């Protein structure tokens, strides 16, 4: 199962998921000026980030909206980036957050698990109902693919719906998490986690500890580190013996070069340093908790 590959990679390289949410404005100006087209510029930047962080990153999350916004050239760069990740024998997450049903969802599954946009995992939004998930499951079963399903996110508006309580005083996101966990039992890896993972925004330790205990078989994709206030201490609560989740950092890694004078000349090196720092911060906290 694909989740076993991710689990083993986390054991070897740590918990960092490098977010390739690559806006043109993130790319050094001198680099933008030296390229005639958007496709080559974006891809060269991404390739350098991947090469520089390969030994310290568990996986790469590519947010499709940043590429769609750039039209056909952007989507070509998106496709090239996913293929390059595969060529480097690394794991990719296509951050597409699809949430449709029936034939439309089947086409989304085909688009992102086959052909030009093929990835190892995709992110999905189940809040229209769990029939949004069903068309992807044959790929999980037969094609060694995985899902990260939105359970509880870290944005401010998450409380508008996800935190609504039922008559039994159970929050909606807990119900969604329980359903993901139950469905995931059919797609378990040898590592003890399912190839049906969950997107679990990092908020605070107490809640993380509760969720980790409730959702024992769910491997977490954890946004919210750094820019949204999550700390290594918070994140460690969502892990079990240092595994069971990957922590996404996008701008923090992509824009690390801006912290240094003339950093634009070594943006790949700066990205690697930030990736290693995040990895080591999380590892240190996890080791202290397990010692």
UniProtKB/Swiss-Prot annotation:
Entry keyword Lyase: yes
Gene Ontology molecular function, alphabetical: orotidine-5'-phosphate decarboxylase activity
Enzyme type, top EC level: lyase
UniProt-listed GO biological process terms: 'de novo' pyrimidine nucleobase biosynthetic process; 'de novo' UMP biosynthetic process
EC number: 4.1.1.23
Keywords: Decarboxylase, Lyase, Pyrimidine biosynthesis
Record pathway: Pyrimidine metabolism; UMP biosynthesis via de novo pathway; UMP from orotate: step 2/2
Recorded catalytic activity of this chain's protein: orotidine 5'-phosphate + H(+) = UMP + CO2
Active-site residues from the entry: 97
Family statement: Belongs to the OMP decarboxylase family. Type 2 subfamily.
Annotated protein name in UniProt: Orotidine 5'-phosphate decarboxylase
Gene, per the UniProt record: pyrF
């Amino acid at each position: 199962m694909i989740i076993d590959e991710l689990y083993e990679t986390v054991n070897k390289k740590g918990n960092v998921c490098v977010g390739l949410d690559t806006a043109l404005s993130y790319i050094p100006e001198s680099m933008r000026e030296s390229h005639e087209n958007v496709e080559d510029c974006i891809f060269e930047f991404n390739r350098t980030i991947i090469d520089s962080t390969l030994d310290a990153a568990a996986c790469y999350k590519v947010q499709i909206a940043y590429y769609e916004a750039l039209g056909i050239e952007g989507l070509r760069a998106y496709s090239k980036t996913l293929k390059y990740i595969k060529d480097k024998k690394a794991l990719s997450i296509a951050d597409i957050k699809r949430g449709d049903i029936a034939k439309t969802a089947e086409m989304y599954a085909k688009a992102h698990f086959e052909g030009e946009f093929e990835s190892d995992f995709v992110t999905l939004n189940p809040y229209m109902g769990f029939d949004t998930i069903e068309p992807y499951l044959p790929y999980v079963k037969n094609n060694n693919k995985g899902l990260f399903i939105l359970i509880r996110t870290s944005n401010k508006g998450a409380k508008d719906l996800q935190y609504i309580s039922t008559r039994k005083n159970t929050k909606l996101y807990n119900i969604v998490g329980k359903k993901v966990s139950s469905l995931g039992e059919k797609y378990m890896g040898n590592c003890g986690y399912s190839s049906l993972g969950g997107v679990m925004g990092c908020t605070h330790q107490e809640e993380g500890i509760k969720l980790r205990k409730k959702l024992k078989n769910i491997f977490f994709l954890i946004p919210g580190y750094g820019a949204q206030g999550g700390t290594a201490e918070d994140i460690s609560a969502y892990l079990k013996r240092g595994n069971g989740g990957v922590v996404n950092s996008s701008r923090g890694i992509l824009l690390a070069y801006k912290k240094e004078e003339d950093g634009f000349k070594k943006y790949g090196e700066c990205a690697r340093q930030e990736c290693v720092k995040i990895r080591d911060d999380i590892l240190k906290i996890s080791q202290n908790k397990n010692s």
